[in-house]
Swiss-Prot record:
<dbReference type="GO" id="GO:2001234">
    <property type="term" value="P:negative regulation of apoptotic signaling pathway"/>
</dbReference>
<feature type="region of interest" description="Calmodulin-binding">
    <location>
        <begin position="291"/>
        <end position="301"/>
    </location>
</feature>
<dbReference type="GO" id="GO:0005737">
    <property type="term" value="C:cytoplasm"/>
</dbReference>
<dbReference type="InterPro" id="IPR011009">
    <property type="entry name" value="Kinase-like_dom_sf"/>
</dbReference>
<dbReference type="GO" id="GO:0008582">
    <property type="term" value="P:regulation of synaptic assembly at neuromuscular junction"/>
</dbReference>
<dbReference type="GO" id="GO:0048168">
    <property type="term" value="P:regulation of neuronal synaptic plasticity"/>
</dbReference>
<feature type="binding site">
    <location>
        <position position="43"/>
    </location>
    <ligand>
        <name>ATP</name>
    </ligand>
</feature>
<dbReference type="GO" id="GO:0106310">
    <property type="term" value="F:protein serine kinase activity"/>
</dbReference>
<dbReference type="GO" id="GO:0008049">
    <property type="term" value="P:male courtship behavior"/>
</dbReference>
<dbReference type="GO" id="GO:0004683">
    <property type="term" value="F:calcium/calmodulin-dependent protein kinase activity"/>
</dbReference>
<dbReference type="GO" id="GO:0014069">
    <property type="term" value="C:postsynaptic density"/>
</dbReference>
<feature type="active site" description="Proton acceptor">
    <location>
        <position position="136"/>
    </location>
</feature>
<feature type="domain" description="Protein kinase">
    <location>
        <begin position="12"/>
        <end position="272"/>
    </location>
</feature>
<dbReference type="InterPro" id="IPR032710">
    <property type="entry name" value="NTF2-like_dom_sf"/>
</dbReference>
<comment type="subunit">
    <text>Interacts with CASK.</text>
</comment>
<comment type="function">
    <text>A key regulator of plasticity in synaptic physiology and behavior, alterations in its activity produce pleiotrophic effects that involve synaptic transmission and development as well as various aspects of behavior. Directly modulates eag potassium channels.</text>
</comment>
<dbReference type="GO" id="GO:0001818">
    <property type="term" value="P:negative regulation of cytokine production"/>
</dbReference>
Length: 530
């Protein structure tokens, strides 16, 4: 008779601590091993919500992670199955994302990029030596072991990883993150370990200049760029990158997977193994600046898509990355959006894609290929322009409120359209048109005898409505001192519509809520001095 199984219940071996983050069917918590006091990150999966296919993915992820023991890979220490929950106990990595750390550094050079990609290639090479293809290499899965200077880079999230025999290639399904997908995956051809090298090439390109080699807001055009291998090295940012670095990128971003460099070969490339002699050590401030924008963009895209997409694939959405200062959880985000697997793609009888669960779409055959680097930079420029216009709207709104506070009717009329419309408490629910209604308050309440007041705009939200119109919504807090020296504050919620005429912004409509009086009267009813 077999010996009884050892006690493996999670709570018997670990103390659960605070939550680090959560995914669709899982939650990540810090835990402490009772016997040693060591800290780990426990990925806790609610198995009641899983399908049979999800169970297979979970078992595959655990099986693969158990095979991998390398200083540059987030290690799985324990896998515990209970009645309704499965626990995966990983390294607790506390250094955050590699890309976020780079932008916080005082110095960053080509040699630093070489050291980063070397560690990534070491992890990939270990995977490939053990018959594992990661399939989802991207910045979000590159973490740092700790906050210490020179901390090791750790490859995380094996939710999409597969097992292969040797150099065998087959169609293992459509999986990965759009901006990092290889041509063979997009062409739905047999593939293998070389898909990871392609993704490493994309990552190295970003490490050197701060933006990706393939990029387009339209996913159709993005996929066409990738399948054609349409990338370049635009001036001036690439002029200062050594030829050896470009040579390695070219060998990684080779469209033919059979001619693509392997991880072992890449580690022997002069730019990697002889970096002290080959790689430049000049600080790359423009790369850092561009990488900050790249990081912000992918985080924003990820946040938006996380709210839009509820895919069935749980395992690629929740592992270990940053959450606060000392702990990590992983949510899939990227400038090219969400991690995808073929299970997520539902086609109807006509072959069109069900967009209710995924952003993947069919690729048209004839699409004009644009220079991705220039397109990316142009879009960043457009984003900066939009940001500048939002600041314009906030500033002109502040100027209008200042005119009200100071009783400057002339200044008020210059900012407002003559046919300004408004819903406001003073009009008792009626729509007021023109500024004569407001003139009464300027002449009788907001005149020269009005005490100094202070107004604060809270949480301004600006919606740009084309090039010449915008709407701003905000909370307005007004403070003033009455003639007895008592402080008063009241709050109102306001929305203003602005229109640009003759290159000047004018307020054409506003809506103000009734004041929430902490004390005091209405927005226009300020108590004059003696």
């Amino acid at each position: 008779m077999a010996a009884p199984a050892a006690c493996t219940r999670f709570s018997d071996n670990y103390d659960i601590k605070e939550e680090l983050g959560k995914g669709a069917f899982s939650i990540v918590k810090r835990c402490v091993q009772k016997s040693t006091g060591f800290e780990f990150a426990a990925k806790i999966i609610n198995t009641k919500k899983l399908t049979a296919r999800d169970f297979q993915k979970l078992e595959r992820e655990a099986r693969i992670c158990r095979k991998l023991h390398h200083p540059n890979i987030v290690r799985l220490h324990d896998s515990i199955q209970e009645e309704n929950y499965h626990y995966l106990v990983f390294d607790l990595v506390t250094g955050g994302e590699l890309f976020e750390d780079i932008v916080a550094r005082e110095f960053y050079s080509e040699a630093d990029a070489s050291h980063c990609i070397q560690q990534i290639l070491e992890s990939v090479n270990h995977c490939h030596q053990n018959g594992v293809v990661h399939r989802d290499l991207k910045p979000e899965n590159l973490l740092l072991a700790s906050k210490a200077k020179g901390a090791a880079v750790k490859l995380a999230d094996f939710g999409l990883a597969i097992e292969v025999q040797g150099d065998h290639q087959a169609w293992f399904g459509f999986a990965g993150t759009p901006g990092y997908l290889s041509p063979e995956v997009l062409k739905k051809e047999p593939y293998g370990k070389s898909v990871d090298i392609w993704a490493c090439g994309v990552i190295l390109y970003i490490l050197l200049v701060g933006y990706p080699p393939f990029w387009d807001e339209d996913q159709h055009r993005l996929y066409s760029q990738i399948k054609a291998g349409a990338y370049d090295y635009p001036s001036p940012e690439w002029d200062t990158v050594t030829p050896e670095a470009k040579n390695l990128i070219n060998q990684m971003l080779t469209v033919n997977p059979n001619k693509r460099i392997t991880a072992a070969e890449a580690l022997k490339h002069p730019w990697i193994c002889q970096r002290e002699r080959v790689a430049s050590v000049v600080h790359r401030q423009e790369t850092v600046d561009c990488l900050k924008k790249f990081n912000a963009r992918r985080k924003l895209k990820g946040a938006i898509l996380t709210t839009m997409l509820a895919t069935r694939n749980f395992s690629s959405r929740s592992m270990i990355t940053k959450k606060g200062e000392g702990s990590q959880v992983k949510e899939s985000t990227d400038s090219s959006s969400t991690t995808l697997e073929d299970d997520d793609i539902k086609e109807d009888k006509k072959g069109t894609v069900d967009r209710s669960t995924t952003v993947v779409s069919k690729e048209p055959e004839d699409i004009r290929i644009l220079c991705p680097a220039k397109t990316y930079q142009q879009n960043i420029g457009n984003s900066q322009c939009s940001s500048a216009r939002r600041q314009e709207i906030i500033k002109i709104t502040e100027q209008l409120i200042e005119a009200i506070n100071s009783g400057d009717f002339d200044g008020y009329t210059k900012i407002c359209d003559p046919h300004l419309t408004a819903f406001e408490p003073e009009a008792l629910g009626n729509l007021v048109e023109g500024i004569d209604f407001h003139k009464f308050y300027f002449e009788n309440v907001l005149g020269k005898n009005c005490k100094a007041i202070n107004t604060t705009i809270l949480n301004p939200h600006v919606h740009l409505l084309g090039e010449e119109a915008a709407c701003i919504a905000y909370v307005r807090l007004t403070q003033y001192i009455d003639k007895q020296g008592h402080a008063h504050t009241h709050q109102s919620e306001e929305t203003r519509v602005w229109h640009k005429r003759d290159n000047k912004w004018q307020n054409v409509h506003f809506h103000r809520s009734a004041s929430a009086k902490i004390s005091g009267a209405t927005t226009f009813d300020f108590i004059p001095q003696k």
